[in-house]
Amino acid sequence: MKDQVIIFDTTLRDGEQALSASLTVKEKLQIAYALERLGVDVIEAGFPISSPGDFESVQTIAKHIKNSRVCALSRAVAKDIDVAAESLKVAEAFRIHTFISTSTIHVQDKLRRSYDDVIEMAIAAVKRARNYTDDVEFSCEDAGRTPIDNLCRMVEAAINAGARTINIPDTVGYTLPSEFGGIVAQLFNRVPNIDKAIISVHCHDDLGMSVANSMAAVQAGARQVEGTINGLGERAGNCSLEEIAMIIKTRSDFLGVETNIKHEEIHRTSKMVSQLCNMPIQANKAIVGANAFNHSSGIHQDGMIKNKNTYEIMTPESIGLKSQALNLTSRSGRAAVKNHMDTLGYIDGDYNLDTLYADFLKLADRKGQVFDYDLEALMYFANLRDEDDFFKLNYLSVQSGSIMATTSIKLQCGDEEKCEAAVGNGPVDALYQCIYRLTGYEIALDKFDLTAKGEGEDGLGQADIIANYKGRKYHGTGLATDIVEASGQALLHVINSIYRADQIAEIKERIATV
């Protein structure tokens, strides 16, 4: 019987740190559902003490996720641990993950404590977390640069205090595979109570070694791997969990381990995270890149025709990637759309068929054929759309020449429809001037991206913007066959978020004065 490797996903915590603007609670819950369906064992939903938004996200995910264990991060500080426990208490089963720095440079220059003091802080943190749950994970931050004698002392103390998972992070991505595997092996050889805990690893990719280091640790006895979908994370990112899962599946004969991952969900989960986080996947990325299963060499193509196994060690279908793009037209009925969604692997709870079909008909009237990737894009945006948006674009007309552009719009502002026209340096600039005038908001754009969703001239355009308003960053997205319209939707997405935030602030202020 093969050993089980626990998959611990931190896309919603460590991964989110790479984003210019935080995900909304709704977006995080959508990703959490996808991770649950993927078969992830533990979902680290956030760092509750860091902000009210993170607390709400963890609490919401803890309430709705049933088949994966929900985890929250905390420093080795009593208040952090108490807040983490409060956010998780609605969960059927949860984990508290507490950590403290252990490397010499961190202990001396960041914590400015003696190593004995740091060990006592770790013991106190683990014991406090155990008051709330038996499932406590303790991390030795910067373990990769921690002297092995100190690391062994810390691990032994944390296990004695009640930690059932000990995480060994390569926090700055410094170690080499043989070195990191050796650290894990020494822990098994030198820590007397090591059999009372699962050893976990959390590797960063600063030197491009995160996956290799994680696999070296598994070979040395680690039985939990932490990482993110698509390797998302600050700096160079984290260990890519889809790569870990497929390495273990493809080389299980050599490794002798397995995971609970449902591999056919990998492609869909990867695509969702990329879309919602606005983080494109490089074409040559292992497993989920657009070129991962392409063969352009004539010799390779000849071999593939004769026997796919000549150059293909895993199939596109094994990660849920369909070999053919499906297409529909405006004459296709609801049943056909549902059948295509079924073929793509989506279930009824993933989308609202009425909403999706209405959006599909509008798109089909515009572009003729609608492909599977179009349906997926429509589904993602429909799931994120708020029915109570105060500002909605009802009409858009653009006249553009070689010098200036003129844009006219009709904007629904609550119960009132307002009209505006403006001249600008291009149609998007003119459109944004109209929106600013009608809404009364003028915001600073930190980032503006346009990407194609689909193939050819009929592909959908996605606009993504990062905006700054009163010191807070907002992320907006828009999707349309017309990039000017998509740009307008993205700005209105941001402005509606700002409007809701202002409304909430006013309510809180009124309550505070009562």
Swiss-Prot record:
The keyword Cell inner membrane does not apply. Keywords: Amino-acid biosynthesis, Branched-chain amino acid biosynthesis, Cytoplasm, Leucine biosynthesis, Manganese, Metal-binding, Transferase. One of its GO terms (cellular component) is cytosol. Its EC number is 2.3.3.13. Its main location: cytoplasm. GO terms for molecular function: 2-isopropylmalate synthase activity; acetyl-CoA C-acetyltransferase activity; manganese ion binding. Residues 5-267 form the Pyruvate carboxyltransferase domain. The keyword Transferase applies. InterPro entries: 2-IPM_HCS-like (IPR050073), 2-isopropylmalate_synth_dimer (IPR013709), AIPM/Hcit_synth_CS (IPR002034), Aldolase_TIM (IPR013785), LeuA/HCS_post-cat (IPR054691), LeuA_allosteric_dom_sf (IPR036230), LeuA_bact_synth (IPR005671), PYR_CT (IPR000891). GO terms for biological process: L-leucine biosynthetic process. Residues 392-514 are annotated as: Regulatory domain. Its cofactor is Mn(2+). It comes from the Bacteria. Catalyzes the condensation of the acetyl group of acetyl-CoA with 3-methyl-2-oxobutanoate (2-ketoisovalerate) to form 3-carboxy-3-hydroxy-4-methylpentanoate (2-isopropylmalate). Homodimer. Belongs to the alpha-IPM synthase/homocitrate synthase family. LeuA type 1 subfamily. This is 2-isopropylmalate synthase. It comes from Photobacterium profundum (strain SS9).
